[in-house]
């Protein structure tokens, strides 16, 4: 069943990225990526290191794709990364797993992000900024013969869980073929690093968010990497606050993941 699912994914990837030199087969790069994903996936519950930055307590009902396999898989599907890929969480067990929900974990050396503007987040202003940036990115997508992406509005407006140092938002989008999707973002602030958790899928939105929220509760920064470990005068401070973080990351990640996944999920 797993192999059959992955083969269907390969066929969909042809639609996204075009065919190989043989004309009707997925590229060798994609085949290799899928093989490695299947070979390296972690299905046993327990502690999983996310580099030296954080730790995932993998729960029953969830599987983990290591960073190398995640990077190879996403690169084969046309994605480019600005941060460090830490891995991917998907639902399943050792007997059966699927890619109907994907949580991509990525870290970025942002510097220490001050949260002083947490109570001043203006969802309307931020949304207009995201739309403006997305429209500008659409111009570049046209040049690359890629479909445009339209931002409909908030699925969940931004909110900040101060005790957890967790910044969350979710955006409703529509791709060029009118395929609707959400882009559910959870951003965990650390000492000088941002840990991003971007969840997408083909199932009901509430199931995507439920799975993503549960996964986030089992990820924690390692000692020395936590927000409260910040040392003034020693650690770099980010040049932006929470509002600018949302607008910048959201616009970039919409083009980074959402358009691709909106295409991939058709027919799953």
Locate predicted features.
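Positively charged n-region of N-terminal signal peptides that target proteins for export
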Residues: 1-4
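N-terminal targeting sequences that direct proteins away from the cytosol to non-cytosolic compartments
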Residues: 20-268
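Bacterial N-terminal signal peptides
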Residues: 7-16
């Amino acid at each position: 069943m797993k192999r059959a699912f992955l083969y269907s994914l390969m066929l969909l990837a042809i639609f996204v990225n075009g065919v190989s030199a043989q004309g009707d087969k997925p590229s060798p790069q994609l085949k290799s990526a899928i093989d490695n994903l299947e070979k390296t996936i972690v299905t046993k519950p327990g502690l999983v290191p996310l580099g030296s930055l954080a730790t995932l307590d993998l729960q029953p009902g969830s599987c983990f794709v290591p960073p190398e396999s995640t990077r190879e898989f996403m690169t084969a599907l046309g994605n480019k990364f600005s941060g460090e890929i830490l891995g991917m969480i998907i639902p399943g067990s050792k007997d059966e797993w699927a890619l109907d929900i994907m949580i991509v974990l990525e870290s970025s050396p942002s510097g220490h992000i001050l949260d002083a503007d947490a109570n001043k987040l203006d969802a309307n202003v931020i949304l207009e900024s995201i739309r403006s940036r997305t429209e500008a990115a659409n111009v570049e997508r046209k040049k690359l013969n890629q479909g445009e992406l339209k931002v409909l509005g908030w699925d969940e407006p931004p909110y900040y869980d101060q005790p957890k140092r967790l910044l969350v938002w979710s955006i409703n989008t529509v791709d060029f073929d009118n395929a609707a999707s959400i882009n559910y973002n959870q951003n965990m602030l650390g000492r000088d690093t941002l840990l991003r958790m971007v969840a997408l899928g083909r199932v009901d939105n509430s199931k995507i968010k439920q799975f993503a929220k549960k996964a986030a509760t089992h990820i924690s920064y390692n000692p020395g990497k936590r927000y409260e470990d910040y040392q003034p005068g020693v650690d770099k401070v980010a040049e932006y606050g929470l509002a600018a973080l949302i607008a910048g990351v959201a616009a970039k990640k919409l083009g980074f993941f959402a358009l691709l996944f909106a295409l991939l999920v058709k027919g799953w």
